[in-house]
UniProtKB/Swiss-Prot annotation:
The lineage of its organism: Eukaryota, Metazoa, Chordata, Craniata, Vertebrata. A divalent metal cation 1 binds at residues 619, 655-656, 781. Its EC number is 3.1.4.53. Belongs to the cyclic nucleotide phosphodiesterase family. PDE8 subfamily. It comes from Homo sapiens (Human). Residues 267-338 form the PAS domain. This is High affinity cAMP-specific and IBMX-insensitive 3',5'-cyclic phosphodiesterase 8B.
Amino acid sequence: MGCAPSIHVSQSGVIYCRDSDESSSPRQTTSVSQGPAAPLPGLFVQTDAADAIPPSRASGPPSVARVRRARTELGSGSSAGSAAPAATTSRGRRRHCCSSAEAETQTCYTSVKQVSSAEVRIGPMRLTQDPIQVLLIFAKEDSQSDGFWWACDRAGYRCNIARTPESALECFLDKHHEIIVIDHRQTQNFDAEAVCRSIRATNPSEHTVILAVVSRVSDDHEEASVLPLLHAGFNRRFMENSSIIACYNELIQIEHGEVRSQFKLRACNSVFTALDHCHEAIEITSDDHVIQYVNPAFERMMGYHKGELLGKELADLPKSDKNRADLLDTINTCIKKGKEWQGVYYARRKSGDSIQQHVKITPVIGQGGKIRHFVSLKKLCCTTDNNKQIHKIHRDSGDNSQTEPHSFRYKNRRKESIDVKSISSRGSDAPSLQNRRYPSMARIHSMTIEAPITKVINIINAAQENSPVTVAEALDRVLEILRTTELYSPQLGTKDEDPHTSDLVGGLMTDGLRRLSGNEYVFTKNVHQSHSHLAMPITINDVPPCISQLLDNEESWDFNIFELEAITHKRPLVYLGLKVFSRFGVCEFLNCSETTLRAWFQVIEANYHSSNAYHNSTHAADVLHATAFFLGKERVKGSLDQLDEVAALIAATVHDVDHPGRTNSFLCNAGSELAVLYNDTAVLESHHTALAFQLTVKDTKCNIFKNIDRNHYRTLRQAIIDMVLATEMTKHFEHVNKFVNSINKPMAAEIEGSDCECNPAGKNFPENQILIKRMMIKCADVANPCRPLDLCIEWAGRISEEYFAQTDEEKRQGLPVVMPVFDRNTCSIPKSQISFIDYFITDMFDAWDAFAHLPALMQHLADNYKHWKTLDDLKCKSLRLPSDS
């Protein structure tokens, strides 16, 4: 049983007849308005969209009498009769159960009705459009008004009918219709163009589409121009046609055309509101640099009113003379290619003062896939020179601290960093995010000296503010990664399917992977080997002819270091070192005599342990040979100066001096004196460099540094230390990744003539020279897999034997076995070599080859890998097939 609709009378005489919210009876929502010169019964009828199309045109739109009857019937609680078919729809029911009503509606028009509430996109914005409202302004009911009324019903639009200009304007101001249809066929009742102008004079009409219904023109008359209608404020003209489908098609076209476009334009108001309240100065120009928009922050920053800027070309504005002469050309070249430009730019304010800005210019692609606009974001650099200008901007604009950007508020406490504003709330955890970040952000802002990583974090935090939630969360994860100490090192996981790789990682890349609680075991081997009696230094003429003849080939990569080891009775370092150092003019650079250099080599070689299977002076000579070979490559030679070359040769010579034949993990687990001394961090590498300098400077007879000035010595010493420490395997991936990102990629971009705005390779920059030297000695240190096959096999046997001996001692002393696969009874040497090459060698030498061009080495690497792979496929665990032994 239905409930009577409630009736409200406005002061202007408008009577609204609304459904009772508690009613569930099916009935039509109607409202009746009284115009100033009309009787009370009604001058316009509103109907919400029906769920079904009336069965016939004959039933027509409800007349005044029908509305009265519908109101009476609804008031008595009965359903509307057939005299008013629109009143018999399920609209009342839909107010209470929309989903069920839609499911029950099975007409061919249902999908059409849903269009009006479909999602609309404008750029990244998602909008939901409310059902379309249509206002029909017809002085009297006729077939044309009926046609539009039923077309609205079919399309699912809400419709109002007004009979007078006054009631039409009142209704429009109340409901803000998207479409207005005005009867322009007759002039005796009202002036259609005057009605249109009166509506256009109101603010809500800015995005309304107004349609003029004009009389059909006979064939013998010329059609009138549409310009007077457009000048009056109409958007479209509709030639009289009372067909419902013709009216329906017209309305649907308007909805998907002008109404949808106007809806998007109306949504742009929110974007402009955001721009107006943005702290960054924003400037939008056309493709030919005519200023189209500036926000209030831009006006405050530059001292201009927007009226002074809009429509002007950027070239007409005063320029600062503090910029580079070619800066504007550089910027234009970049943005004309459709690429973003970012950098520091000096701008001139209206007052004539120059201010330094962080500027980001983004091209915007428009019609035809061409650049149509440029958007510039500008922020003041908070430098000392800008402080006065910032104060002046504040004073002129009258901004208080509540509206100032952070870059202004922290102007006296920060230098040269991107502003970080308060982190906007995101999702349900926003309060916790904000509370968690604020103290740290405040501390970052208060820094007077900022590290590069701090600036990076500032930029990311600033980017989070205007990012979608998913992007902000991803940037949170980025920040967590950046706050770790191992930025370039991969996360090392255990490879169950490859125990060799797992053990190599554990044994070479960790210090004391499995520690004992109290260092119960002490490494007792004397790693500070006492000096053996040294023979008198030899002269160049004392070198035996057989050694001299062998050294004639030392510049070749295929030089056989083991032949030199045998012929020199395991003292190859002195002989090879003298030859290599002479070739690179080391004595001349250090201003030392050859006698001093020979004495130094003898002292260093004496402190290598000949009892070690691998880490002995032959390995040092091999690394020195590889380093010298790399220094002879054209690109390496062009990247380093002589001091770098001398430092590299010395570092290669001493890089493993006094090596005990055990890994860092072993020393840490054993609680050795060296591990305690160096806090379990880079134990051996720190010891090698420290001992090398101790041995060098304690005796003037072998002090090769005694004749260079203090500054040169400090620079040389730092370079040597840095290179030796780079051989520590825990930093392996960090060094390789830095080299690839800082050297290889920029160099590749240069070679390929890329248009990207990246910095040049800058190989001669000090920071890049450091990366090159680190990479060079790392490759020289583990170049065995890139040697000719016979040499590669010999080195593989030696390193395996040293690891076997360590495993034996770990078991004997009850220490953790850090590399269990290196058990001499079960180990597969081919598998261990394959794992070492796959995990450590291939990527590093690919990167080094891309820089230094080493095709012969890469071929050896491929051949050797094939050798080990063949042995492994045959289940052979030794260095060679039994038939080859």
